[in-house]
């Protein structure tokens, strides 16, 4: 959980800085974390955030 909190902090900073490439990478990492935890709701939420940032990064 400590690693998740670190990723989340980095994700929030990348959003603040409008660094969508970094935000998408972190969202994908967080998505994989929740998938490994077996939490489908969080996995789905982070998959959507990942896709949003990928689209904005282009």
What name fits each language-model region?
Residues 1-28:
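N-terminal acidic leader/helix
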Residues 20-58:
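Short, charge-rich amphipathic interface segments used for partner binding and complex assembly
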């Amino acid at each position: 959980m400590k690693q998740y909190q670190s990723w989340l902090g980095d994700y929030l900073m990348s959003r603040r800085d409008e660094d969508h490439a970094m935000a998408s990478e972190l969202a994908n990492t967080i998505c994989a974390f929740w998938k490994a935890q077996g939490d489908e709701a969080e996995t789905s939420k982070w998959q959507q955030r990942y896709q949003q940032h990928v689209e904005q990064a282009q």
